[in-house]
Amino acid sequence: MKEKIRTLQGRVTSNKMNKSAVVAIERFVKHPIYGKFVKKTTKLHIHDEKNECSIGDLIEIRESRPISKTKSWILVKILEKNIF
C-alpha cells in the first residue's frame, strides 16, 4: 500500500538563508476544556532550490527525505506572491 504524500500550505516568514526558507503553518485546534478554537502556528524549515520564494508568499510544500538537520520539506509551488 502506498503512503500518501503530505502537503501543507503556509506563509514564508524568512528567506535569509541560501536555498532555504522558514514557513509558518497555521491551524485551528479546539481547546479541550473550553471548546474555543485557538490558532496554533508551526514553523518549518524548507528547501528552496532556486531561491524563488520571498517573505509573505503563500506556498505549498511537501515532505521529503531529510536534507539537513532541520530541513525535511521541499517547496512545490508558489500559490500567491506577496505584493509588497
Curated annotation (Swiss-Prot):
Entry superkingdom: Bacteria
UniProt GO BP: translation
UniProt KW keywords: Ribonucleoprotein, Ribosomal protein, RNA-binding, rRNA-binding
Pfam families recorded: Ribosomal_S17
GO molecular function, one term: structural constituent of ribosome
Record keyword RNA-binding present: yes
Family: Belongs to the universal ribosomal protein uS17 family.
PANTHER family: 40S RIBOSOMAL PROTEIN S11 FAMILY MEMBER (PTHR10744), SMALL RIBOSOMAL SUBUNIT PROTEIN US17M (PTHR10744:SF1)
Protein name per its UniProtKB record: Small ribosomal subunit protein uS17
